């Protein structure tokens, strides 16, 4: 894993518009990127837990969140934006990979500036909160999403589909008695999404693979991840973006004292 500093991030994304789409994990991806643009410090646990706040690290809540009544339903909305003199990063919360709301986001791109980078994932809500045909619906919606992205976005936009990080069993799930559980659903969903993304020749980062040996960085709820994991996630994203643009990667060795050092060395250990 390459070693980016905050200064490297500001240089790489200079005068770029980056959009992150997805669920609460993707919100944390957005938050770590926003924080990394300003400092080398990691997110705090409290910052990771909060949602819908009016301001986070000099960003602003644009729509939804605490502007409205907070809830955990499928109609929840949250749009955030960080803007500096030379950087623009925006986040849209999704509860489904393709929907009428997603079309409204695409309309934003058509009427306003188009993103230079689009980072997206949606899986857990799709497979956990909708119909009994959730896997078939998910495949259909992935096809619709990727086709619409190619129709709406500029060919110069770097679209990065991230597979979902490894999920654990919920406290209410007894693995041996459960035909459908979150862990297995995520594995199936990742297989479908990677297959469809490849068919549409989109860039794909397999975050399930990258974090397969980092389960100690996952939170007790079996879904979310700690600040060290999210900084590693950001480093992987930035490495891919730089390579895609033909930009030389930063040189240097990660200090052994860095929390990321242990996480990065896990990537090179054989899976037991």
Label each PLM-derived region with a short phrase.
Residues 5, 65-68, 209-210:
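Intrinsically disordered, low-complexity segments enriched in polar/charged residues with Gly/Pro
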Residues 17-136:
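Conserved SGNH/GDSL esterase-like catalytic core that processes O-acyl groups on lipids
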Residues 88, 92-272:
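Alpha-helical cap/lid subdomain in secreted, periplasmic
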Residues 4-13:
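A short acidic-Thr-Gly-centered motif at the start of a beta-strand
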